[in-house]
Amino acid sequence: TNANLVASTPTFPATGQWNAGNDQELCTPTTNANLVASTPTFPATGQWTLVSGTGSIANDNSPSTTVTGLSVGVNVFQWTVDNGPCANPITTDQVTITLFDQNNPVANAGPDQNVCTPSTSTVLAGSAIIGPATGTWSVLAGTGVFVDANSPNTTVNGLTVGENTFAWTVTNGPCANPLTVDQVTILLYDGNNATPDAGADQDLCETTTTVLQGSAVIFPAVGTWEVDQGTGTVTDPNDPNSTVTGMGVGVNEFSWIVTNGPCAAGSGNDEVTVSIYDADAPVANAGQDASVCG
């Protein structure tokens, strides 16, 4: 009978630590993921919602469900638990599913560059990236300060005269080749590099060897000796003070050629003549005196 019926009220758990699960990183062509949240205690209920990005939730009331149609980038889902009249009745937690693009280009730091003082800056030309992949510039040699170390086309300031080498590192999550690196070298030439001077001409005897006296060059400028006339073997063609051997008697002419990159000054060439005299040449003899009768 109705006299034996007792009304009942649902009992909700007093507390709960509701968790939307661990963040995930995936790579195309996959566009699906499994959501795994903590299960609320009945009669509490849970519901999934899309916060940002894209995704179709198969069962938005199930803590463990499938989401399809993820987009490349960051996709955020929220697990909301309704715990009735308890303290903190509505609690939420979010999970982020980051989808990386398998077709993201491998790292390319761009072409090497030649720059001349007084400039100490240039614009880098790294390969573009497809987010959420990230790219980062770093200094391998020389100096440089990046305006934005994560921009492929950033400006780098504070270059030093000489060789400055930078790495462009691209990180692409869990995809194949997740980390690729390429390097670029920026050569900064000194606009104050001296005008080429091959040194003073030399007159020698009883030797076939001498030391050349070319003007010094400031790296990365390059100087090179070449034989223009006569004979001779230059021991180190790029040393302004190289030894030259094997010269023959007569005139031996050498050029000191300096290349100073894109600078207007400091490039060119100069010549030096090394004359080798023969120690065995006959002494002067004008012949016998002669008398002539008018």
Please name every model-derived segment.
Residues N2-S8, I90-F100, L179-Y189, G268-Y277:
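C-terminal edge beta-strand
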Residues A14-N22, N103-P111, N192-A200, D280-G287:
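Proline-enriched interdomain boundary motifs that mark the N-terminal boundary
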Residues Q24-T31, Q113-T120, Q202-T208, A290-G294:
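Short, solvent-exposed loop/linker segments at the N-terminal edge
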Residues L26, Q47-S62, S138-S151, E226-D239:
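Low-complexity "stalk/linker" and mucin-like segments enriched in Ser/Thr/Pro/Ala/Gly
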Residues T30-P40, S119-I130, N153, T208-I218, ...:
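A short beta-strand segment in extracellular, disulfide-stabilized domains
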Residues T41-W48, I130-V139, I218-E226:
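Solvent-exposed loop segments of extracellular immunoglobulin-like
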Residues S62-V76, P152-T165, N238-E253:
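Solvent-exposed segments in extracellular or luminal domains encompassing
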Residues D82-N88, T171-N177, T259-A265:
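Short, solvent-exposed loop/turn segments at the edges of extracellular beta-sandwich modules
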